Structures are given as structure tokens and as C-alpha cells.
UniProtKB/Swiss-Prot annotation:
TM regions (residue ranges): 111-131, 133-153, 173-193, 197-217, 228-248
Family: Belongs to the YIP1 family.
Domain of life where this protein originates: Eukaryota
Record annotation: effect of changing residue 70 to V: In YIP1-42; temperature sensitive; abolishes binding to YPT1 and YPT31, and inhibits ER vesicle budding
Organism: Saccharomyces cerevisiae (strain ATCC 204508 / S288c) (Baker's yeast)
Gene: YIP1
InterPro entries: Yip1/4-like (IPR045231), Yip1_dom (IPR006977)
A GO CC term attached to the entry: endoplasmic reticulum membrane
The protein, known as: Protein transport protein YIP1
Locations listed in the record: Endoplasmic reticulum membrane; Golgi apparatus membrane
Record GO biological process: endoplasmic reticulum to Golgi vesicle-mediated transport; protein transport; vesicle fusion with Golgi apparatus; vesicle-mediated transport
Chief location bin: endoplasmic reticulum
């Protein structure tokens, strides 16, 4: 190691001063890479943190998995497949769950299932030669807002009951109970419904959706002997979609 000596500038002629060998720095004593690497390794071992790389591969890239210690993406955004399956079963077999609906299912505001059902309804109409995606989502949005406000007016004066009734709860219930009308639109692909048989079948599917949705809302609002009163506006709401399948 050399440095410029300013004190003996006149004697040495302004040159560089080379220290003796006894003051030389030993080789490798200032190797920062080894020191930092060893300290980091010691800290990692002390903290118990192990290397945690992401899995590689095209399948992992398209999946919703992240690091092993992190929750899945679907869980973080609130999509629960168990609730989706349970709600779908309740709509398909309403008599089986006639004793009561769990409060956890009623308070679930999942909209993944309703969006899928409305998309299937539009696709089935498209396969039947009817393009009504704008009408479907427009009527669904306007009807959900109207039925939510009406349900709040019909709910009890209990504060806890009113706080449980949120807009997305109403939208989730109406969307899941829309599933029978998807079967109606699927039937319209293979057979025309603008006849007496089609009218009867459409009425049955509308009643199916109305009965299940009124049961959900009646349990959520904790009303007594008011299911038929709730069912009347729901019947009108689902009848609009049945008319799309038959006439439009």
C-alpha cells in the first residue's frame, strides 16, 4: 500500500512513500465478501429463516400459489370454494336445507358464483342466437339495487340485523339463486320455449329461483311469516330473465 508523504516532501523529492514490511497489511484481512457472507449466514441460522424460492415451471406460473408461508391468492381476495359449493347445493336442493341456513353462509358476500352464472346465462342465450349481455347485466344491477333497498325497508328495527344486510350479501343471494334460470336458457338451445310447454317450464324455474332466494333473505333478515311478501318482488325480478329466454 503506497501513499503520498507530505511531511518529507523536500527530502524525498515529492515522491510516494512506501512503508516497511512490518506495517504492511496482511493479505486477506480486509476481505469484506467473506465477512459479510459469514455474518449473513450466521444471522439466517440464528433467526431460523431458510431460503424460500418460488417454484418454477409453467404450471406454477399460471397457478394462484405463492411462497409456502403465504396464504393462497384466492383466500386473500375472499373466494371460498367451500361456501360456493354449499350455496350451490342449497339452491339445487332447497328442501334438504329447509331447517335453516348457517349464519356464516348468509353473511358470505362472494360474487364469483353469481358472475359465473350470469355469464353462463348469456352464453347459452348466445348459442340460441340471442345476444343480450347488456340487458342481462343491466337488469341484474338495477334489480339488485332495488331489491336491496326494499329488503332494508322490510328488515327488523334491530340494529344488529340491519348491519348484517349489506349490498354484496343481497347480490350474492340473488346471483346464486339465479342458477335455475341457467338451466332454462340451456334448455332453450335445444327446444323452443315460445309455446305452452315452454311457458309452464319457465314458470317452474322462476318459482324455483324465487323460493330459494326468499328463503335466504327471510333467514338473513330474521323475519316472521314474511316469506311470501319477500317472494313477490323476487318473482318479478326473475320473470324478466325468463322473458328474455322465451321472447326476446
Amino acid at each position: 500500500m503506497s501513499f503520498y508523504n507530505t511531511s518529507n516532501n523536500a527530502n524525498n523529492g515529492g515522491g510516494f512513500y512506501q512503508p516497511s514490511a512490518q506495517f504492511a497489511v496482511p493479505q486477506g484481512s480486509m476481505s469484506f465478501q467473506n465477512t459479510v457472507g459469514s455474518s449473513n449466514t450466521g444471522n439466517d441460522n440464528n433467526l431460523g429463516v431458510a431460503p424460500d424460492p418460488l417454484p418454477v415451471g409453467i404450471l406454477h406460473a399460471l397457478s394462484t400459489k405463492g411462497y409456502p408461508h403465504e396464504p393462497p391468492l384466492l383466500e386473500e381476495i375472499g373466494i371460498n370454494f367451500d361456501h360456493i359449493i354449499t350455496k350451490t347445493k342449497m339452491v339445487l336442493i332447497p328442501i334438504r336445507f329447509g331447517s335453516g341456513v348457517p349464519q356464516e353462509i348468509l353473511n358470505d358476500s362472494d360474487l364469483a358464483g353469481p358472475l359465473i352464472f350470469f355469464l353462463l346465462f348469456g352464453l347459452f342465450l348466445l348459442m340460441a342466437g340471442k345476444v343480450h349481455f347488456g340487458y342481462i347485466y343491466g337488469v341484474a344491477l338495477f334489480g339488485t339495487i332495488s331489491l336491496h333497498n326494499l329488503s332494508k325497508l322490510m328488515s327488523n328495527n334491530d340494529t344488529s340485523t340491519q348491519t348484517n344486510l349489506q349490498f354484496f350479501n343481497t347480490a350474492s343471494i340473488l346471483g346464486y339463486c339465479f342458477l335455475p334460470l341457467c338451466f332454462l336458457s340451456l334448455l332453450g338451445i335445444f327446444h323452443g320455449l315460445n309455446n305452452t310447454t315452454g311457458y309452464v317450464v319457465s314458470v317452474l324455474f322462476v318459482i324455483w329461483s324465487t323460493w330459494t332466494s326468499s328463503g335466504f333473505l327471510n333467514s338473513l333478515l330474521q323475519l316472521q311469516n314474511a316469506r311470501l311478501l319477500i317472494a313477490y318482488p323476487l318473482l318479478i325480478f326473475y320473470s324478466v330473465f325468463a322473458l328474455m329466454v322465451i321472447f326476446v
